Regions:
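Extended, small-residue-rich solenoid/repeat segments and analogous flexible loops
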Residues: 1-37, 41-53, 58
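Glycine-rich hexapeptide-repeat left-handed beta-helix
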Residues: 34, 39-40, 46, 61-66, ...
């Protein structure tokens, strides 16, 4: 069902079994594949290609020329661009620029800098090892395709390169010139520890950008996790 409160450019191509919520705007030269679900107040800019099934949650923004493949969920108020395949972005996160993200799970309130690229397959095409938090070691995922697992409130700098099967914790800031470790512990600032008040300030700024409040409960949850990492 397509709401009669949407604005859809007549040049847009909408596939079968597509649902579109109210107050959504779809620009020209957009292609939306079969089985796609689009919430309310979503903006899809010119030239975006969406190969369903895909879910775009309320308030999401799809940038010009984005290429999004099936199996992808874009959370509430996320902004996405570049190329994304078979990935989940939880609410309020951004992957707004060129770069590849595949077979990945991105937490809430994350920001991937321009040209951040995630490998989801080894050069050897073999099975990928991932970090096991219980064993505190890498184990075989038995998956040929596996991207990055990123905790809430984590950010990457421009041109960041992430290896296949990388696990990144909460509240990290990734800006190494080379590949970071395949396991990055929570609250990492490059190779050092992120100062908690600095993390709070950064989170507050992003909350303002998304029109949301940085609650006492969120601060406390991060502080509790920070203490457990010491």
């Amino acid at each position: 069902m397509i709401s009669n409160l949407t604005v859809i450019d007549p040049r847009a191509k909408i596939g079968a079994n597509v649902e579109i919520g109210p107050f959504t705007t779809i620009a020209g030269d957009v292609e939306i594949g079969e089985g796609t679900w689009i919430g309310s107040n979503v903006t899809i800019m010119d030239g975006a290609l969406l190969r369903g099934p895909i879910a775009l949650c309320d308030g999401a923004v799809v940038k010009m020329g984005a290429k999004i493949y099936g199996g992808t969920t874009v959370g509430v108020k996320c902004t996405v661009g570049g190329e994304i395949k078979n990935s989940i972005l939880q609410g309020y996160s951004n992957k707004a620029h060129d770069g590849y993200l595949g077979n990945s799970v991105i937490g809430a309130w994350c920001n991937l800098g321009a040209d951040t690229n995630c490998s989801n397959m080894k050069n050897t095409m073999g099975e990928i090892k991932v970090w096991n938090y219980k064993a505190k070691d890498f184990i075989n995922s038995r998956q040929q395709f596996c991207g990055v697992f990123m905790g809430d409130y984590t950010k990457t700098a421009i041109s960041t390169k992430l290896n296949s099967g990388t696990s990144i914790g909460l509240g990290c800031n990734i800006f190494q010139a080379d590949f970071p470790s395949k396991y990055v512990s929570s609250f990492s600032w490059g190779e050092e520890k992120f100062e908690l008040e600095g993390l709070h300030r950064m989170n507050q700024r992003m909350k303002v950008l998304k029109g949301e409040e940085y609650t006492v409960e969120e601060r406390k949850a991060l502080e509790d996790n920070y203490e457990s990492e010491l």
